[in-house]
C-alpha cells in the first residue's frame, strides 16, 4: 500500500505552477530555503556528495543543493510539481535526477547508495512518517546523515503554524497543515532510533512577523529540524 495521501498530492499538484514564484503560496519555502541549505552544507559539505531529497516537490531544496555542488536525486509522488522541477532545470542549467517513486520503493532498489538524505517539510503530510524515516535510513550509507524537519505538536504550534500562518497572516493556503499529523521531537527521535539512526542535532526555526524573517535557534516549539547519523 502506497504511503501517501492522495488529497495531499492533489493539493500540492494544483499549486505546482507557482512553486518557483517567491511571492506565491510558496513564499515561506523560498524564505527558509537558504537557511536549510546552509545548515545541511555546514554539516556535510555538499560539494561532491550524493544526496537524495525525499518529497522534493517543485525542487527548491534539490536544486539549491545542486548549486552547492551536490549530485542530487529528487523524488516525489506528485506528477505536477516534478514537472515544474524538471522545467526549472531548463531555465537554470542545473542537474538534478528527478523521479516519481516512493521512498520505500527506492530503498528496495538503492540501499546504502547516498551520502546524505533530506526529508524536509514532508513528514507531516504522509499517513506513516515512521515508514519514510526507515526507508531514508536504508538509503543512506553507514555513517551517512539523514536530515529531517517537521512541525511540533502543541498548542503554540497550532496557534502559530495553523491559525497564524494560514488564517491571520495568510502566509499559507487554508488547509495546508493538519494539526493531528504534527510530530513531537521525542516521537521523531524514537522513530529515528528504531531505524538505526542516531539523533545528533535538534534545531528550531522561528519566524518574526515584524521583520518577516526566519532564523535558526533553540526554540523547537513550532518548526524544527533534526540531523541524524546512520550507525555503521
UniProtKB/Swiss-Prot annotation:
The keyword Methyltransferase applies. Pathway: Cofactor biosynthesis; ubiquinone biosynthesis. One of its GO terms (biological process) is methylation. S-adenosyl-L-methionine binds at residues 36, 55, 76, 120. Keywords: Methyltransferase, S-adenosyl-L-methionine, Transferase, Ubiquinone biosynthesis. The keyword GTP-binding does not apply. It catalyses: a 3-demethylubiquinol + S-adenosyl-L-methionine = a ubiquinol + S-adenosyl-L-homocysteine + H(+); a 3-(all-trans-polyprenyl)benzene-1,2-diol + S-adenosyl-L-methionine = a 2-methoxy-6-(all-trans-polyprenyl)phenol + S-adenosyl-L-homocysteine + H(+). GO terms for molecular function: 2-polyprenyl-6-hydroxyphenol methylase activity; 3-demethylubiquinol 3-O-methyltransferase activity; polyprenyldihydroxybenzoate methyltransferase activity. Its EC number is 2.1.1.222, 2.1.1.64. O-methyltransferase that catalyzes the 2 O-methylation steps in the ubiquinone biosynthetic pathway. Belongs to the methyltransferase superfamily. UbiG/COQ3 family. This is Ubiquinone biosynthesis O-methyltransferase. It comes from Dechloromonas aromatica (strain RCB).
Amino acid at each position: 500500500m502506497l504511503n501517501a495521501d492522495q488529497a495531499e498530492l492533489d493539493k500540492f499538484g494544483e499549486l505546482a505552477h507557482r512553486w518557483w514564484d517567491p511571492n506565491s503560496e510558496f513564499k515561506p519555502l523560498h524564505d527558509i530555503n537558504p537557511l536549510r541549505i546552509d545548515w545541511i552544507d555546514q554539516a556535510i559539505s555538499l560539494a561532491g556528495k550524493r544526496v537524495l531529497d525525499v518529497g522534493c516537490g517543485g525542487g527548491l531544496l534539490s536544486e539549491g543543493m545542486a548549486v552547492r555542488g551536490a549530485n542530487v536525486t529528487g523524488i516525489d509522488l506528485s506528477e505536477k510539481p516534478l514537472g515544474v522541477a524538471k522545467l526549472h532545470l531548463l531555465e537554470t542549467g542545473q542537474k538534478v535526477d528527478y523521479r516519481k517513486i516512493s521512498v520505500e520503493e527506492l530503498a528496495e532498489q538503492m540501499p546504502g547508495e547516498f551520502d546524505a538524505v533530506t526529508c524536509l517539510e514532508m513528514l507531516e503530510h504522509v499517513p506513516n512518517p515512521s515508514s519514510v524515516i526507515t526507508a531514508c535510513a536504508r538509503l543512506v550509507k553507514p555513517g551517512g546523515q539523514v536530515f529531517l524537519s517537521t512541525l511540533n505538536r502543541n498548542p503554540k504550534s497550532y496557534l502559530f503554524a495553523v491559525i497564524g500562518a494560514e488564517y491571520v497572516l495568510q502566509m499559507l493556503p487554508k488547509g495546508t497543515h493538519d494539526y493531528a499529523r504534527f510530530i513531537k521531537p521525542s516521537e521523531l527521535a524514537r522513530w529515528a532510533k528504531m531505524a538505526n539512526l542516531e539523533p545528533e542535532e535538534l534545531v528550531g526555526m522561528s519566524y518574526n512577523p515584524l521583520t518577516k524573517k526566519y532564523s535558526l535557534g533553540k526554540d523547537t516549539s513550532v518548526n524544527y529540524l533534526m540531523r541524524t547519523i546512520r550507525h555503521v
